[in-house]
Amino acid sequence: MLADLHMHSTFSDGKLTIPELVDLFGSRGFGVIAITDHLCEDVTPIGKAARYLGRTLTPATFPLYLEILKSEAERAREQYGMLVLPGFELTKNSALNHRSAHMLGIGISEYVPASADPLELARAIRVQGAVAIAAHPVHTRKVEKQTYHLWDRREELAAELDAWEVASGPYLFDEVLRSGLPMVASGDLHQPEQLSSWKTVFECEKHPEAVLDAIRKQELSFRFFQDSIYGKEQLHDVRVGDLGVGALPDAV
């Protein structure tokens, strides 16, 4: 069951609406997606700018966001047989990379202000029965803002986070592969051209709780998906229990 657990809609900084995301992934046979729009802290200049520009979920927009996710989840199930999980990306952006942190909540049902410490944010996600995932915690291999704060605190946060992204888009992160931490792989899609990326594969029941439990238990594998519209489709499997870490290049 092919899954992408990190993507953005027009509720934050994505180019596609939620229905368009459902159609993009559903038409390609995905079994599970999580829509995870940014929810930025509102106490910093960067966070305030995101609110001004309409690039973040807010207490005012969050109820409508959940309502549309619920409606589209029903359509996705009926039209594509695809599971849609509600999520957000708690976003703490600083001018300094080592103070910036992004954390996914998947399976969420309640708004969580992003201004708290990451330790408290993870607990606020998990108390809802959702999973907390460190988003792109190391260098993404792209020229963009980096978010190192969770990785800097990985020993402290290891017991509070359910998984760490081992890939974001087309790049695998050697540091996370070698860490022994639980992992997922996702695309961090903002526009259709980013569809080709590493994905997570589940072999569990197609049910929200089964998927969340598979993340917690690490009953999953990774697969590179290259969309046929942008090139020849190729799938390459990487299983969590058989990563061949010793053959990987040195970590960055």
Regions found by a protein language model. Name each.
Residues 1-9, 18-23, 44, 93-110, ...:
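Charged catalytic cores and adjacent phosphate/nucleic-acid-binding surfaces used
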Residues 80, 97-101, 127-131:
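Beta-strand-turn-beta hairpins that frame and shape the catalytic cleft
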Residues 87, 135, 186-187:
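Generic beta-sheet signal
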Residues 34-35, 133-134, 165:
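Conserved beta-strand positions in the central sheet of alpha/beta enzyme cores
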Residues 131-143:
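Aromatic-lined carbohydrate-recognition surfaces of secreted/lumenal glycan-active proteins
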Residues 84, 132-133, 183:
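Hydrophobic beta-strand scaffold residues
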Residues 1-86, 90-91, 122, 152:
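An N-terminally biased module of ancient metal coordination in phosphate/nucleic-acid-related enzymes
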